[in-house]
Amino acid sequence: VMESIDVPTIYEVPLVMHRQHLDEVVLSKLDLPSEQEPDLSSLQAFVDKVKNPKRTIDIALVGKYTELPDAYKSICESFIQAGAVNDCKVKLHYVNSEKIDASNVGEKLGKMAGILVAPGFGNRGIEGKIEAVHFARTHRIPFLGICLGMQCAVIEFARNVLGFKDATSTEMDPATKHPVIDLMEEQKGITAKGGTMRLGAYPCSLVPGSKAAQAYGTTQIQERHRHRYEFNSEYLKDFESHGMKAVGANPDTGLVEVVEIPDHPWFVGTQYHPEYKSTVQRPHPLFVAFVAVSYTHLTLPTTSRV
């Protein structure tokens, strides 16, 4: 008889099963050799850190599917894993972007150590995401934008720094005069459903010395994608001359994959989904760096944050 007891974290389940010798029973039933005792020390160390954090930090996850947090399950787990590396518990605050505007953004996000603007599709809630980006940028709060979150960062910068007040993505407004986010030219004639999706893993070259390169510890990475729209490189010179840099690009196509604002404590947007590659054994370096700098921001005197 094997007990399936409640545990504080799902990551402890294999340890509980091992203590009851369930692994040996399964191997025996399958007539497989069980000569070597498994080394679960790294998993045990991870679980110990998850269960006994030295501190807690509050990070906002701004999205439009927040009524169902499992929509962001991969991001949530990435924060658990990155938190363990930093000896802290990340308390996620799910903030519905449809309910954010200029009048309440400070109330909703002002006490956060970091702000993540989540992926998604479509126009609903987009202005709230852009408002959250603006708050993070102008209040110098650590920021990570993923996929649509990165695109919102580009749109916000175009509107409020470059002065293109109608700037947006052609996903939201096909007739916009400033399509800073757009379909690639070769995609525009594709009509088959899903045909314009950029899916799977692609290489990315990072600029040496950028915050992204510092987090990864290398300039050559490969990350997974799931999106249709891209940074419009026709605007790249405008962005870079005003302080938003393209620090990651596909080496074959030149498509922009990572943007940063160097004159900010930590402002990073990725077109790809870093959460897809985060694991217990290898927490994603961007999440690890984001959590670390968010904790540093939390400990700064209030007057030093702006």
How would you label these PLM feature ranges?
Residues 2, 91-95, 247:
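General small-molecule cofactor/ligand-binding pocket signal
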Residues 108-203, 209-211, 280, 286-294:
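Cysteine-nucleophile active-site neighborhood
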Residues 208-263:
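Catalytic beta-strand/loop cores that center a nucleophilic Ser/Cys/Thr
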Residues 45-49, 188-225, 232:
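Glycine-rich phosphate/pyrophosphate-binding loop
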Residues 1-58, 67-74, 104:
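Flexible inter-domain linker/hinge segments
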Residues 296-302:
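Conserved small/polar residues in nucleotide/adenosyl-binding loops
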Residues 259-282, 286-289:
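A glycine-centered loop/beta-turn motif at secondary-structure junctions
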Residues 58-131:
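Phosphate-binding active sites in nucleotide-utilizing proteins
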